[in-house]
């Protein structure tokens, strides 16, 4: 009995130590949770600041664009364009933006992410409509995608990868359309570009050669890009071919919007105009101006200098309105509703507490 009494304090000491360790573990766990909460709160604040900055910047750009529009010129452009022209332009705009959703769809497939198409379409449409107008697509488009995709478990690194893969889709489409137009309609393009026929054909052949080299690379090699610890596995041949088709379809639809708005009697074939449009887009992208504004228009005007300048300017103004400004305003409204709804739901969930279930 005495032995038991002597052992009892030892057992109590051991039990007390175990309890202390358990309390310490709970305390540390609580500290970790608190630190995680603090990190989430900081990220939420940063996200709110970025959201506010992007929305404010968007409305500033929108205000400036609207301020530069001459209402008389806009009215003249609308009067000179027929209802049929405007209707076809609207349809082609919708087709182009619908194909743009394929950019994100292919990228998500490559990254192994399964996201509902309605979410993909929303993220794609809003990100492109915003970045087309504001410029700097890696920043503006990436930010919008982060807003939409992050609640569905897609991390920032994968969103960056998605943006790069979508960019590859765009450039594959641009390259094949330009190369085809330069080779197939070299004579007409040479007249517009004021270059020699041989140079035009050679440029088109070089474009096809570059595309062939890319496809050989993705077929025979395991295409992986490593940049300072960031690793991206590029799509293989089958998915790359789908990328090229989607990109080409988008470029053709977008070019069609401007083509149908041009004044009648220009005698320019759509296939020839594709080369003019793609080169204008490339120069606009190189200028880093939002939507390539100014550079794009100047390139089109120089290439189509045989057409009435007023008519081409009117077509360009309508093109900016239908393809850029209207989708931009729609995207802003959609994002505003989306962000407001998400923040209201989050506030309601916090107010309800963990016992609401």
Protein language model annotation of sequence segments:
Residues 128-137, 167-179:
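Mid-bilayer segments of alpha-helical transmembrane spans in multi-pass integral membrane proteins
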Residues 117-151, 284-287:
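Hydrophobic alpha-helical transmembrane segments of multi-pass membrane transport proteins
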